[in-house]
Every structure is written in structure tokens, then in C-alpha cells.
Amino acid sequence: MMMQRTQLLLPLAMEATMLAQQQRGMATLKMISIRLKSVKNIQKITQSMKMVSAAKYARAERDLKAARPYGIGAQQFFEKTEIQPDEKAEPKKLLIAVTSDRGLCGAVHTGVARLIRGELAQDEANTKVFCVGDKSRAILSRLYGKNILMVANEVGRLPPTFLDASKIANEVLQTGYDYTEGKIVYNRFKSVVSYQCSTLPIFSGSTVEKSEKLAVYDSLDSDVVKSYLEFSLASLIFYTMKEGACSEQSSRMTAMDNASKNAGEMIDKLTLTFNRTRQAVITRELIEIISGAAALT
């Protein structure tokens, strides 16, 4: 009686096992197919973003060539006047972080934030940060939120203009923070595949007025110094924003190109896995058919 029951249940158990294996194989194929479709869609997005970044990079590079005289002229003014911070005054430092509101561009914004974190670690109590772009604020606010003086948003969606730089320079001067020295921290464009995190010195109006080389001009009053200081600060910010925009677009273009290549490699691996899994399912089904036919004969 037990043998008869075993003989009756064994085919049912084998059939249930084969059915479960078949369903598991089909479920695996469906999961691979869904993932493959998702990766292909991501690759289309990254390829499109690469093309957009390439077009924006070409324009940013042209704009940078036109903006460099602004930065060079302002730098020469500070170099030739040999302005030095007042050692007797209480040391107060201002750091202007030039980034943007947009991501997906490698370590462009992280490099600027890393350099500023190093400055803050040395003298946190006497250092304030003016963030140009929301990315620098997001990174620095985790540890040094109280040191952020002000944030300029809506940066990076459109190419920076001198009007944008003038507004930022005016906000810097209107903050009421009487700094003795400062730096503009930005990314200096070198080539399509490289950039360097650099700094440019800036000084307050009181520090500039105390320069010995400027003191020889009798007609140089505080209003003239203030006007030129506003223009030179706007010129430096404009120049650094153009350098940062060009570095950002080239880095985003490279990042999207790498992402597209990685997606292509993943598509190849998933396609191979899909074909192997499908072949295994087909082979298993053929074995089941042949085994069933052999059992009937």
C-alpha cells in the first residue's frame, strides 16, 4: 500500500518541482529584462546630457577667453600696489566659494569645499564664507553652518554675466563684515580633462587705503578707492565664475561620457546573462518534454 502511494505521489512531486523551476527561470528572465531596459534608458539620458554639456562647454570656453582680461587686470592692481593685510588689526578672513547649483559634474564642487574646510580648520573663529552657488553651502553647512555669511543662489543654470558678478560683489560689500583679507576659491580651467582648485586674494577698502604705493596720490580719496574696489571685486568674481563654469561643463561632459561607457558595459553583461538564463530555461523545458515522452513509451 505504501509503495503504491509513493508511486502515485512521486510523479506529482516531480511535476511540481519542474513547474517551480520553470517559474523561477521565467521570473529571473523578467527581472533581468526590466533591469536591462532601465540601464538602456539611463544610457540614453547620460548620452543626451553629454551632448548638451559639450555644447555648453564650447560656449563656456569662448566666454572664458573674453573674461580673462577682467581677472588679469584686477589681479595686477593688487600685485603692483603690493597691498598687505594690516597686522595690527584683528585678523578677519573672508572666503568666497565659487560653485553653482547643479551637480553631476565629478568633484568640481567638492574640491572647492575641501580647500575651504582646510582654511576653517585653521582659524574657524575669525573666518566667514560667502557661498556662490548652493552646492558649496550644502557641503559646508554640515560642519561649518555658523560660518556661512551669505549664499547666492540661481547660479549655473545660465552662463554667468558681469551683472551677476556685480550683484554678488555688491552683496559681499554690503554684508557689513569688516574683513582684513580674503580669498576667492574657484576651479581654474586647464584643459578638457583637467582643472585645478585655486585662490585669488581680495582686500577690504580700509586695507587698500593703507597701501604705501597708493598714498603717493594726493587726489585719491576714499570714494575713488571704494569705486575701484567694487569694480575690481566684480571683475575677479566674474572671471572666477567663468573659470568655474568652464571647468564644470568640461567635468560634466567627461562624467557623462564615463557614465555612458559604464552603462554600455553593464548592458553587454546583462544581455549575456539574459541569453544564458533563457538558454538554460529552454534546455530545461526540452529535457522535461523528452523525459515525459520517454515515460509514456
Swiss-Prot record:
Chief location category: mitochondrion
Mitochondrion as UniProt keyword: yes
Pfam family, one: ATP-synt
Coiled-coil annotated spans: none
Topology class, membrane: Peripheral membrane protein
Localization in the cell: Mitochondrion; Mitochondrion inner membrane
An annotated GO cellular component: proton-transporting ATP synthase complex
Alphabetic keyword roster: ATP synthesis, CF(1), Hydrogen ion transport, Ion transport, Membrane, Mitochondrion, Mitochondrion inner membrane, Transit peptide, Transport
Alphabetical list of PROSITE patterns matching this protein: ATPASE_GAMMA
CDD domains cross-referenced by the UniProt entry: F1-ATPase_gamma
Family, as annotated: Belongs to the ATPase gamma chain family.
Functional description taken from the UniProt entry: Mitochondrial membrane ATP synthase (F(1)F(0) ATP synthase or Complex V) produces ATP from ADP in the presence of a proton gradient across the membrane which is generated by electron transport complexes of the respiratory chain. F-type ATPases consist of two structural domains, F(1) - containing the extramembraneous catalytic core, and F(0) - containing the membrane proton channel, linked together by a central stalk and a peripheral stalk. During catalysis, ATP synthesis in the catalytic domain of F(1) is coupled via a rotary mechanism of the central stalk subunits to proton translocation.
Record text on subunit structure and interactions: F-type ATPases have 2 components, CF(1) - the catalytic core - and CF(0) - the membrane proton channel. CF(1) has five subunits: alpha(3), beta(3), gamma(1), delta(1), epsilon(1). CF(0) has three main subunits: a, b and c.
The protein's name: ATP synthase subunit gamma, mitochondrial
